[in-house]
């Protein structure tokens, strides 16, 4: 069945003018999701342009199955556009991607964080540079294959304002990675797959006769060959591979390691020490290159402090979260459902109190905020986790350890 004969998608673009008078740029990664978006919009009669970004060319990474925007993906996107009968363009964003995504990714690991480069890519490349390019091409919208919903916000005092909501397919929910999308970007972006389950997306791809119908989903971090973070970090930041001590929360030196880049908060396997008790990575002390370990209960966190907060509520952040705070739901992991929380803003900063404690929260990760726990919950934005507070005894032990002098 051709794209012209398919039923309309569940999520429309909400424009007042006719589709044939509406130009839409589709960000095409070469995967099934963005390809189906292009096909659905073409079927509805929109003036569709496909754009693929050449983001990197790092040897093995380009040829790795499941990578995004690499050589094969560009070819796949081109074939899809030929099948659909729409123009396709490839833009070289390698330098920009390296400066705004890859280098900060490595720097974050050196600082003892566990970064999310996909958020940075959306912030600085896809929803900034590509969006600007779409506007230069006279497009009315930039459409992507993300699983998230957007629709007009009836509570907004500004006509045309849109809000983000969780998608129909909770297993494919990408709202966690899109918390940093600004209001201006949301108003211009469209997400036609927000109301579709993934299985339906693949079915549509087969009906359209697209070469990517059975293509595997892309991996989260596209530029890391075979998932070996340490290789690219060591290449860009050799200091991250410097040896250091593995220290217990109680101050005992238990062993040594070959670089904090090999560890993340909450890790148990592969620490490299045998003590007869289960120990977990509790903190990465980048300044003194110490990996601090402790029992599982030392990981439990009820409060996280945020930086670079992107607030998408109807009131200002200060109005909403001062005083008793803003009751909401929070996700500190992409795979978890939103859980009850309270957002606060005061003299100490912006922080979220989690009603149910979470274990192994790492700085550099995200905390996304929602109106409710279920699908179609509104996305209120979020921020990057700057630090977390553990249960009192573990927090006291950690502060004492960090304040103590380190042997030369």
UniProtKB/Swiss-Prot annotation:
Q: Is the keyword Ribonucleoprotein in the record?
A: no
Q: What is its main location?
A: cytoplasm
- Xref: InterPro entries: MnmA-like, MnmA-like_C, MnmA-like_central, MnmA-like_central_sf, Rossmann-like_a/b/a_fold
Disulfide topology = 121-222
- Single GO term (MF): tRNA binding
What functional role does this protein have?
A: Catalyzes the 2-thiolation of uridine at the wobble position (U34) of tRNA, leading to the formation of s(2)U34.
Q: What is this protein's name?
A: tRNA-specific 2-thiouridylase MnmA
What phylogenetic lineage does the species belong to?
A: Bacteria, Pseudomonadati, Pseudomonadota, Alphaproteobacteria, Hyphomicrobiales
Q: What are its GO cellular component terms? A: cytoplasm
């Amino acid at each position: 069945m051709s794209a012209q004969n398919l039923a309309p998608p569940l999520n429309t673009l909400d424009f007042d003018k006719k589709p044939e008078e509406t130009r839409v740029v589709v960000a095409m990664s070469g995967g099934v999701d963005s390809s189906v978006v292009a096909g659905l919009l073409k079927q509805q009669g929109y003036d569709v342009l496909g754009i693929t970004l050449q983001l990197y060319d790092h040897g093995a990474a380009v040829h790795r199955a499941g990578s995004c925007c690499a050589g094969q993906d560009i070819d796949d996107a081109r074939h899809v556009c030929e099948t659909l009968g729409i123009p396709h363009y490839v833009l070289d964003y390698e330098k920009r991607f390296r400066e705004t995504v890859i280098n900060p990714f490595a720097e974050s690991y050196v600082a003892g964080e566990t970064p999310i480069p996909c958020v940075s890519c959306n912030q600085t490349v896809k929803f900034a540079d590509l969006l600007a390019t779409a506007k230069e091409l006279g497009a009315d919208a930039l459409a992507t294959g993300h699983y998230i919903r957007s629709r007009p916000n009836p509570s907004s005092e500004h006509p045309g304002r849109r809000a983000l909501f969780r998608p129909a397919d909770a297993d494919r929910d990408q709202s966690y990675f899109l918390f940093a999308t600004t209001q201006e970007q949301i108003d211009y972006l469209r997400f036609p797959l927000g109301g579709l389950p993934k299985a339906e997306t693949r079915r549509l791809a087969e009906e359209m006769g697209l070469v990517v119908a059975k293509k595997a989903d892309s991996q989260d971090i596209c530029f890391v060959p075979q998932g070996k973070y340490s290789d690219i970090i060591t290449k860009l930041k050799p200091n991250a591979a410097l040896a250091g001590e593995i220290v217990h929360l109680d101050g005992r030196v238990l062993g040594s390691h070959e670089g904090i880049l090999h560890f993340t908060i909450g890790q148990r396997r592969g620490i490299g020490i045998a003590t007869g008790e289960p120990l977990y990575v509790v903190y990465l002390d980048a300044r003194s290159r110490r990996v601090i370990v402790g029992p599982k209960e030392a990981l439990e966190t009820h409060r996280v402090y945020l930086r670079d907060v992107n607030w998408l509520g109807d009131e200002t952040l200060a109005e909403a979260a001062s005083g008793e705070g803003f009751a909401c739901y929070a996700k500190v992991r992409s795979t978890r459902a939103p859980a009850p929380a309270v957002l606060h803003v005061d003299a100490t900063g912006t922080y979220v109190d989690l009603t149910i404690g979470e274990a192994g929260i790492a700085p550099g990760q995200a905390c996304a905020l929602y109106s409710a726990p279920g699908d179609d919950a509104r996305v209120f934005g979020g921020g990057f986790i700057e630090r977390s507070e553990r249960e009192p005894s573990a927090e006291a032990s950690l502060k004492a350890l960090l304040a103590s002098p380190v042997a030369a």
